[in-house]
Amino acid sequence: MNLNEYVKQVSLEDFDWEFRHQAYWNKRLRTTGGRFFPKDGHLDFNPKIYEAFGLETFRKIVRHELVHYHLYYQGKGYRHKDRDFKELLKQVGGLRYTPSISSPEGRLHYQCQQCHADFYRKRQIDLKRYRCGRCKGKLRLLKQER
């Protein structure tokens, strides 16, 4: 797939605005689906996301990065916390967060007892000392996946 042409196509179809810079694959990205660089306007994308989740999810990530891109060049709020960003992202149907591609093998599986959020860690944590970051509930070790 020609990434640059695909990003230009998504920009025209979903935003009706032209993408005038370059888009690149970046194999070093681990936890993020893509990045926007305001200094020179280029976009980086994680090829592992495309391979793991397919074109539909990848298109939503492209939309997310294009929201940053277009809002920046319109002089509007382009950061995640800005209202303009949240509204345009919702309007075009982009992903707010990248789905996780890390495998839980060889990790400890913790779960919050209140909100049932799952956490995977390589190192064991002291359950008396740490709480859930989302709701402050107590954590419990479900199983060691080693």
UniProtKB/Swiss-Prot annotation:
Q: Which molecular function terms from Gene Ontology are attached?
A: zinc ion binding
Q: Record's Gene Ontology CC terms?
A: cytoplasm
Chief subcellular location equals cytoplasm
Q: Where do the catalytic residues lie?
A: 65
Biological processes annotated in GO: response to stress
Binding residue positions for Zn(2+): 64, 68
Cofactor-binding details, from the entry: Binds 1 zinc ion.
What cofactor(s) does the depicted protein rely on? Zn(2+)
Q: What is this protein called?
A: Protein SprT-like
Q: Which organism is it from?
A: Streptococcus gordonii (strain Challis / ATCC 35105 / BCRC 15272 / CH1 / DL1 / V288)
